């Protein structure tokens, strides 16, 4: 069934489940109750794919970081796919996955907007003011980015960078997941040169 026109989002009340495309802007056009029905292909993939997933997001640097992680894993003999916002849709590789396959998943704020599952390893590089044309404001944008770690458990990992202008340190500290700041320099590398 096709719904068009200014009030096309009103039809969400007629369905139990709505699969949203990342480009559709919802903002505050529908109620919170109706938003609970919304999912996405990203959410479905994260919830139902049993493989290890390394998810990368941030305002800047997602593609570079995702590509580096992919190439490091690939060059070290791992069976790995680079998927997501970088160009290959996640479900395009589903029939190629083996038990040991690792997925490096570049995730935009739009892809994270309606997820209810975090990847096994979540990387949040940074958060700056962007994409505010899509969201009601910076808080809504940050809320989407935070979904990458919101559902982590004690067996998961969060690696994070420049995020504390918009996210409280206490929120990160209270996560049950293993945490590592990019600034921690656990290898004790001399970065002054």
How would you describe each model-predicted region?
Residues 1, 184-193:
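Short, intrinsically disordered, charge-balanced linker/junction segments flanking boundaries
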Residues 1-9:
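Long, basic/Gly/Ser/Thr-rich N-terminal segments
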Residues 8, 40, 191-193:
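General structural signal for secondary-structure boundaries
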Residues 10-17, 22-157, 166-177:
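Phosphate-binding loop of NTP-binding sites
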Residues 161-162:
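Conserved Class I SAM-dependent methyltransferase catalytic core
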């Amino acid at each position: 069934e096709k719904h068009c026109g200014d009030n096309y989002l009103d039809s969400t009340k007629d369905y139990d489940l709505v699969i949203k495309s990342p480009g559709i802007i919802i903002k505050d056009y529908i109620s919170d109750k109706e938003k609970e029905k919304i999912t996405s292909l990203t959410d479905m993939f994260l919830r139902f794919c049993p493989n290890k997933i390394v998810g990368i997001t941030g305002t800047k640097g997602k593609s570079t970081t995702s590509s580096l992680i992919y190439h490091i894993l690939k060059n070290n003999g791992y069976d790995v796919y680079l998927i997501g916002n970088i160009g290959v849709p996640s479900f395009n590789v589903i029939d190629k996955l083996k038990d040991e396959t690792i997925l490096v998943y570049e995730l935009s704020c739009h892809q994270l907007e309606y997820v209810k599952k975090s990847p096994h390893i979540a990387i949040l590089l940074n958060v700056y003011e962007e994409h505010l044309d899509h969201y009601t404001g910076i808080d809504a944008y940050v809320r989407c980015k935070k979904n990458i770690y919101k559902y982590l458990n004690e067996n998961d990992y969060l690696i994070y960078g420049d995020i504390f202008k918009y996210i409280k340190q206490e929120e990160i500290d209270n996560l049950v997941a293993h945490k590592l700041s990019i600034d921690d320099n656990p290898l004790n590398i001399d970065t002054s040169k």
